[in-house]
A protein has these predicted regions:
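Sec-dependent N-terminal signal peptides
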Residues: 4-13
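Terminal presequence/propeptide segments associated with secretion/organelle targeting
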Residues: 2, 16-674
Length: 674
């Protein structure tokens, strides 16, 4: 990735100006986009999207479990999110005897809905710009404290936008009595698993259904049998009319992280160092876990959520690198920066300062990422930390220990430790005297790992109960890792570019860009705050001679169905429904066939955190549940290209079809108004 005169000539006109469907917009400022939205098929007003004076669509959107989105679809707090967003909760409720991951779960009444310990959802009350309050000397902590005192269950955050050029206060109501209502079998909800993840065409019924409960005053409350279904200010009406190519779509959700304004230095680090290293490390971890899961149903359940979490980013990073290379993102950044230099010679020092700051911090940030991908993944050391946590009572400590061992296998952890200690030893860019001494004492990283697991007495709950944690070899290891962690966590920021030494130059740089590039539509990077994105249903040209249509159907599921492959072994009930064409009201005529729609794609700008987001038509009605992007679209966190980037949506008609024909839970339809 070297700068060349040829590239500068070819790309001198390159800009990162607004493309038709690019952007993740703050809903409180959506009035600036309404004219464009209406020209593309939106029928409502800005007040319908976001209002603090009346119920609006924002009141039906939830931040689910701290990292996903969900949508409320009834007057009784029923909400839909992705299966992969509810996966941890479903897995925690599952046992070998009651395997809800494999078999699914469907409550047939409110009484059968299962409490999900620790699961929380947040509903936005309002957002306020507080840039001036901070400039006047008020602290973030003071602003948050005042906001949280306003109501029962209020939680607040102050988030920076445009690298600190603006700041907003977000006030939420936090609900922590959330119960599982329904989840399809994994071979529907995760159909295709890692093989199909980030891939189009897609046939995954990636949804799960929960319900929010509140106290008698409709306020957030801890779990109680006396709690009642929450009555939201607004819920989404469901449309079963379907979609066609060109239809308007809108996403309302909590995108987690984008890097729209990073420079070529950061793109080079991501594509050539960070992503390739993390991909290789996670490949090792997935191979170890996958081999163990094949040998034992118990291990498969224990490590199901862990495996899914590791695999998701692993495949995403692969697509990100491919997309960056395919679009020439690095070269475009170089050319854009050169245009900025030429147009703003008095501000060219900002790019020089950014480049110097990157050079100062790249090794430290790489070490943080290496620690996160290697040492952090060795689980047994957590027992040491729990045992030493003085904030816990004896009862709380034992409960935490029991929860840890519930989903732990010491033989799997041993293999992971061997692989990750060797990898850390190979790639480390910082000194680690304590760990290096342990390696040297036992004859190397692998030898030390084997010695550690041969001699620890913490390998199982039963062994733990009679062990002395303070003198156990795992404690010695945990202390050695803590030395590394203290250094690594100095660089624990969302992205490399958010390290203060780098970010301090981004604030004036982005401000200068906004003053200079008047053709570019600027929006704040995603940071897990509520955003609106809009686009249209559209296929795309995947490769030369290969056009991907925007809709998939049940026929694609049957073509992939394979009883010999776990991830494609669909429930027999679905085979039976297909064989008899017992589709009920969910059957449609499409391209001359009687079928059931499954998924579709659109041009909405999305990222992680948008999983589970409501996908709405021009009337603000729910037409699908967002759950993924196409593989090459994963680079849209850095560069969005409308010709290539597509988000993947589970058609709401397939959700309802599965609820009805597979789950037999049609009792939910009345409250959803279907």
């Amino acid at each position: 990735m070297k700068r060349t005169l040829l590239l500068l000539v070819l790309l001198c006109a390159t800009t990162f100006s607004a493309v038709a469907d690019k952007g993740m917009w703050l809903p409180s400022l959506i009035s600036s986009r309404i004219k464009d939205m209406k020209s593309k098929g939106f029928k409502l007003s800005a007040e319908d999207i976001y209002s603090i004076n009346q119920a609006s669509l924002k009141d039906a959107v939830v931040l689910f479990d701290g990292g996903c989105t969900g949508e409320i679809v009834s007057e009784q707090g029923l909400l839909i999110t992705n299966h992969h967003c509810g996966y941890d909760a479903i897995q925690a409720l599952s046992t070998v005897e009651n395997d809800y991951l494999t078999n699914g779960y469907w409550a047939m009444s409110n009484a059968e809905e299962l409490p999900c310990a620790g699961l929380k959802v947040h509903i936005l009350v309002r957002m306020d710009e507080v840039t001036d309050r901070l400039a006047a000397g008020e602290t973030r902590e003071e602003i948050i404290a005042k906001a949280e005192a306003e109501g029962v269950g209020y939680r607040a955050k102050v988030e920076s936008m445009y690298y600190g050029n603006q700041a907003y206060l977000f006030i939420y109501r936090e609900f922590n009595d959330v119960r599982l209502v329904g989840a399809p079998p994994t071979t529907i909800g995760k159909f295709g698993a890692d093989n199909d993840n980030w891939i189009w065409p897609r046939h995954t019924g990636d949804f799960s259904i929960f319900r929010i409960y509140a106290n008698e005053n409709n306020e957030p409350a801890a779990y109680s049998a006396d709690n009642k279904p929450y009555k939201p200010a607004r819920h989404f009406k469901i449309s079963t009319k379907g979609v066609k190519e060109g239809d308007f779509t809108m996403i309302y959700g909590f995108p987690g992280n984008t890097q729209e304004y990073i420079t070529s230095d950061a793109v080079e680090y991501i594509a050539e160092t960070s992503d390739p290293t993390k991909i290789a490390l996670r490949t090792e971890r997935l191979d170890i876990i996958g081999a163990a899961q094949k040998l034992s149903p118990e291990t498969r359940i224990k490590y199901a959520a862990k495996q899914a979490n590791i695999a998701n980013a692993w495949k995403k990073w692969q697509g990100e690198v491919k997309g960056i290379n395919r679009l020439g993102t690095y070269d475009k950044k170089v050319a854009y920066e050169e245009r900025f230099r030429q147009a703003n010679p008095d501000k060219a020092y900002l790019l020089d300062s950014l480049s110097a700051a990157y050079k100062r911090n790249i090794d430290g940030y790489f070490h943080y990422e290496l620690y996160s991908e290697t040492l952090r993944g060795i689980e047994l050391q957590q027992v040491v930390y729990i045992a030493a946590d003085e904030r816990l009572s004896d009862e709380e400590r034992m409960a935490a220990i029991e929860l840890f061992y519930k989903d732990f296998d010491v033989n799997v952890d041993r293999q992971l430790a061997i692989a990750m200690l060797k990898a850390y030893d190979q790639h480390a860019t910082a000194d680690a005297p304590m760990l290096e001494a342990l390696f040297e004492r036992e004859g190397g990283a692998e030898a030390y790992a084997n010695w550690l697991y041969d001699n620890t007495k913490l390998g199982s709950l039963e062994a733990y109960k009679s062990a002395c944690v303070e003198t156990d070899p795992m404690t010695e290891f945990a202390y050695a890792v803590s030395e590394i962690r203290l250094e690594a966590m100095k660089y624990a920021y969302r992205n490399l570019s958010n390290i203060p030494d780098i970010e301090r130059w981004f604030r004036p740089y982005v401000k200068a860009l906004m003053e200079w590039d008047k053709e570019r539509a600027f929006f704040p990077d995603a940071n897990l705050t509520l955003r609106v994105a809009y686009g249209k249903v559209a296929g795309y040209q995947y490769a030369d001679g290969e056009y991907h249509l925007p809709q998939t159907t049940i026929e694609g599921i049957m073509q992939k169905d394979n009883p010999d492959i776990y991830d494609y072994n669909i429930p027999q009930r679905l085979r039976d429904v297909y064989a008899t064409k017992d589709y009920g009201r969910w059957g449609i005529e499409l391209n001359g066939k009687y079928t059931v729609p499954v998924c579709f794609i659109a041009t909405n700008h999305t990222t992680g955190g948008n999983s589970g987001s409501p996908v709405l038509n021009g009337k603000g009605e729910l037409i699908g549940v967002n759950f993924d992007r196409t593989w090459l679209s994963t680079m849209s966190d850095i560069e969005f290209d409308e010709t290539l980037c597509r988000n993947i949506i589970c058609d709401i008609r397939y959700v309802l079809f599965v609820v009805d024909k597979v789950g037999g839970a049609g009792w939910l339809f009345e409250e959803m108004g279907i």
